[in-house]
């Protein structure tokens, strides 16, 4: 397995929306980033290159049979990521996400756990939320945007309600 195939599996282009949502939530808290720069940095890394990336690996693993027909050039069906390594990378990246989230306290850990549960339930049989337009879209909207935004706001303000009015 080569590094370019691994990076392609994690789909960096998809990381921006949850990272942006976390940053917007942090801004909406009304708190100074200079006092909480480490929380913001860890949160942005957690939402994009870790949680979102793990969801991409998990989804590609469980879609490998369909991708073998529709998109055979992808890393798993093309064999650039051999055997069960696609699954192993999804598991490793999910566990790494939980480890990093533990540095954000209880709120950060449980928000990450919920996002990861949604990402696995979205793709993994027999649940496969993606097979239902309502449940699949709900899982994506919560784990990609909603949860990231709320977590960014909550981690900086230490509450679910901002201390200052915002234009949300």
Where are the language model's segments positioned?
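Multi-pass alpha-helical membrane architecture of UbiA-family
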Residues: 1-168
């Amino acid at each position: 397995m080569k590094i370019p195939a691994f990076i392609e599996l994690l789909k960096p282009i998809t990381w921006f929306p949850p990272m942006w949502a976390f940053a917007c939530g942090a801004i909406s808290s009304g708190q100074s980033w200079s006092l909480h720069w480490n929380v913001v940095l860890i949160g942005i890394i957690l939402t994009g290159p870790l949680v979102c990336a793990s969801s991409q690996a998990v989804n590609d693993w469980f879609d490998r049979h369909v991708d073998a027909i529709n998109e055979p050039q992808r890393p798993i069906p093309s064999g650039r990521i051999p055997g069960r390594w696609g699954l192993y990378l999804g598991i490793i990246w999910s566990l790494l996400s939980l480890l990093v989230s533990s540095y954000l306290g209880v709120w950060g850990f449980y928000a990450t756990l919920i996002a990861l549960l949604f990402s696995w339930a979205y793709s993994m049989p027999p649940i496969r939320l993606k097979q239902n337009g309502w449940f699949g879209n709900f899982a994506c909207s919560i784990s990609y945007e909603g949860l990231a935004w709320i977590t960014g706001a909550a981690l900086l303000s230490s509450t679910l309600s901002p201390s200052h009015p915002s234009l949300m």
